[in-house]
Amino acid sequence: MPLEMFMFATTRMALLIGGAIGGATFPLFAQETTKNDTVIVTSPVQSGATKLATPDIETPQSVSIITRQQFEEQGATSVRQAVSYTPGVYSNQIGASNRFDYIVLRGFSDGSLDNVYLDGLKMMGDTNSHSSLVVDPWFLEDIEVVRGPASVLYGRSSPGGIVALTSRKPAFDAGGEVKLFAGNNNQRGAAFDVTGPLDDNERVAARLSGMTRYADSQFTPLKEERYALMPSLTWRITDRTRLDLMAYLHRDPEGGSHSGLPYQGTVVPYNGGKISNTFFEGEDDYDKYDRRENMVGYNIEHLFDNGWSVRQKLRYLHTKVTLNQVYAAGWLNETALNRGYSGSGEKMSAIALDNQLDGSVDTGAINHRLLVGIDYQDRSNHTTGYYGAFPPIDAFNPVYGAQPDYITLYSREKHKLRQTGYYLQDQMSWDRWRFTLGGRYDRVSVSNIDKLHDSRSDLDKNNVSTRAALLYLFDNGVAPYLSYSTAFTPTSFADENGNVLEPMKGKQWEAGVKYEPPGGNSQFSAAVYRINQTNIATKEEPTDPYRSIGEIESKGVELEAISHLSDSVRLQAAYTYTDIRYKKSSPQEQGKRAVYAPRNQASAWLSYDVKSGLLEGLTLGSGIRYVNGVTSDRLNTHTLPSYTLVDMVVGYDLSSIGLNGLSAQLNVNNLTDKRYVAACNSLSYCYFGAERSIVGSVSWAF
């Protein structure tokens, strides 16, 4: 994006918001949520579903908040692992691969790499390439999973929902942490975090976090290696003006594996045998995934005397990805697999900008908490692609060291996307009633430029997204709600003729109930929903062109319980039922269920802290995850076997024996070392689940 164009867009948006502020004369403070005095709410607060801090009990949408304490206790080393005990989510789409954070929401896998947000701004990955971004959980404060369409506030997004990440911010109380860890598969690493004020007046605070991690992947000899650093600074310019600066520098010089194997040989025997779940079908000299991510951004906010506030968020990112992969391409004979080659070099730059104005006004007995916003996204990705072939490999007795039969340049492209959105939200409160209305208008431009063949395709579209929701707060902590919302997802995918596909559109009806016992520390929720999406971009095999296949419908039920059963016992439990099927498609796919979408999922995590006695400081925890009803392909030829995984943690706070700030923890995931296939894209590409992982860590907090 040219600098002058970006400056023009930013200035135009700032002027529009500034003009709105000039006419604002409302007296109420924007950050306070109005509640009836007789309703006592101790609800956790979310902002992903509304862009404003709102108690979850007052939010007429399914939201799960995964705290740092939760995902650290469970030993999560990626965002997808951190949400694995969350309803409505399937985070095992590619099994043991840790390269990307694939997160399937309410059965929708398309765009699952592009529904992640950091500090309110889209991560801006390109799903039509290998340039998909990740943030290590070490740098996160919490994770919100917002289920259902969110286009009314965010524009293009999956109808299944979004994942909203919140980074760790500078604190004016000095402190820090150092952590060392090691485990099986040669896992090892270190992390640190330090924060505190930089001046005596506590106007400026800084934070610096960093980590490194290394491991042999499940598919030897591939490795996983990561280095990341996040500096941030908070400046209280005045009592009413605050500036937050942040940067994120991330390097994965080794990205592990990301490949599948045939259904025959993984799920069921082939020629009387099964392939090992550690089998590597590639060539070490030719398999490589190297990702560099650099982000820098700011958030500036000002509170006016009349209680209204204005804020601007901006983030710029630049990524560079190199991919070389030798992959299996079906059985050649009784023991050997054909092999192909895929290579890519990519450079991507993107800007995400969001301007917001919010405040409150009363109209009679109704309080309106208003949010007006203008956001802008611009992404450009330059890609060069190669394909080729390698000699076959024996899947049961592999011999490595082969050279390619050929490698050929097949594409040199530029993918461009630009989105400008104007949105309005009104959160109304009247007695115990809560009404939410929202609308958004988007202008979206998508271009695919084929430099190799000197051609291009363009798509310019406008879209209107809406939301309407109603919730009632009973004084016993029960809150039933009903909502309607829409979604749209413009794409850079093209058909076999090079034409960019039409944006996917979705609509959802959702009904649910939330319950928070007064005076307690528990949250319970239940939701039923139906989502219909049209113009879906998909392909049946990796080499096939993308196409629009019509309409898909997802219906489901989600249950969640988060409870502190006592001062020592914590419970997290969830159940998900998902029925997602093609409603309008080819005759072969009509009525069939989508891949990557389990019919049933259930999970529970229970932990216990010993508060007194000889074992004071000890934490014991265990979790169980059950998955059932994953189909093998789009024709539903087979259903994968159900699987159950057991996880556990043992922690010890050594402060109880006088070693203040020191703690130790042991995490074991897949305790029984279950061999299973997590999902299949087709009968040609199925993905082994992760084997047992054992990691011990020692931390010192100061």
Curated annotation (Swiss-Prot):
Pfam families, sorted: Plug (PF07715), TonB_dep_Rec_b-barrel (PF00593)
Location in the cell: Cell outer membrane
Stated role: Ferrioxamine binding and uptake, in association with the TonB protein. May play a role in intestinal colonization.
Iron among keywords: yes
Key words, A-Z: Cell outer membrane, Ion transport, Iron, Iron transport, Membrane, Receptor, Signal, TonB box, Transmembrane, Transmembrane beta strand, Transport
Topology versus the membrane: Multi-pass membrane protein
Domain TBDR beta-barrel: 173-702
Top-rank lineage group of the source organism: Bacteria
GO molecular function, one term: signaling receptor activity
Gene Ontology CC, one term: cell outer membrane
Protein name as it appears in the record: Ferrioxamine B receptor
Family statement: Belongs to the TonB-dependent receptor family.
Signal peptide region: 1-30
Keyword Magnesium: no
CDD domains cross-referenced by the UniProt entry: ligand_gated_channel
Domain TBDR plug: from-to ranges: 55-168
Coiled coil: none
InterPro entries: Plug_dom (IPR012910), Plug_dom_sf (IPR037066), TonB-dep_rcpt-like (IPR039426), TonB-dep_rcpt_b-brl (IPR000531), TonB_rcpt_b-brl_sf (IPR036942), TonB_sidphr_rcpt (IPR010105)
Main location: membrane
